[in-house]
């Protein structure tokens, strides 16, 4: 199957923060064979490649954007088999386009433990790996066994966890030599019971609903927590940014590290709030807050 090319996708319609102008094109990859034609398609279209799943950690700028969106839309059913190296472990291969909540539902039904903390986190499996998404003590890197990636320099390769860099909200594959697309991942999970896994997921999801604006248009946490372990949300709280807004954008009144689109906000409003918060926190506490949300185009 060849890549499917869509003209002029509007990122406001493709990101959970509901911001963003029009990209040059979107290249949708519906199966593994479609990756073969990707380099030629990108060369013909021009622009900067940008990989997009559900757009749940993206702040896209308004206006015309020199981006070609790559959408790894593979959604084959997860496959599971016993780990030959560990009796209490199960390996699960998942396509990048599978939504994270769908995967968690499958894991709960099979009593497979390791990602309960990500209950309530939106996005796709590929996107979760690409940013090493994590919550409540779990992250994708901690259960990653291998990842199948495509890059212009390598083609499709399977990379073991030992050859990946999994850091706090960061994931990279040095062998890729530049941009790459996650096509599928294999996770190593612990055997548990369906009841225990479901109960943990339910508890984590309920806690998120109480403490995070999960029903509003947001892109998750704006800033990473500083390396000394202090919460970025607490620093923003101390500096008076909980609930502070500009135009249609505001820091959530429920959790200060979430930026929400209240009413037709703009990317300029969002960037002004982010820059104001960064400067205020650095002046008051000495902490320079590093972005967790991805700004498109990159700065």
From Swiss-Prot:
InterPro entries: FAD-bd_PCMH, FAD-bd_PCMH-like_sf, FAD-bd_PCMH_sub1, FAD-bd_PCMH_sub2, MurB, MurB_C, MurB_C_sf, Oxid_FAD_bind_N. Gene3D superfamilies: 3.30.465.10, UDP-N-acetylenolpyruvoylglucosamine reductase, C-terminal domain (3.90.78.10), Uridine Diphospho-n-acetylenolpyruvylglucosamine Reductase, domain 2 (3.30.43.10). The lineage of its organism: Bacteria, Pseudomonadati, Thermodesulfobacteriota, Desulfovibrionia, Desulfovibrionales. NCBIfam families: murB (TIGR00179). The keyword Cell cycle applies. Keywords: Cell cycle, Cell division, Cell shape, Cell wall biogenesis/degradation, Cytoplasm, FAD, Flavoprotein, NADP, Oxidoreductase, Peptidoglycan synthesis. Belongs to the MurB family. Its cofactor is FAD. Pfam families: FAD_binding_4 (PF01565), MurB_C (PF02873). The active site is at residues 169, 221, 292. One of its GO terms (biological process) is regulation of cell shape. GO terms for cellular component: cytosol. It is an enzyme of class 1 (oxidoreductase). One of its GO terms (molecular function) is FAD binding. Its EC number is 1.3.1.98. Cell wall formation. PROSITE patterns: FAD_PCMH (PS51387). It comes from Oleidesulfovibrio alaskensis (strain ATCC BAA-1058 / DSM 17464 / G20) (Desulfovibrio alaskensis). This is UDP-N-acetylenolpyruvoylglucosamine reductase. Its main location: cytoplasm. PANTHER family: UDP-N-ACETYLENOLPYRUVOYLGLUCOSAMINE REDUCTASE. It is found in: Cytoplasm.
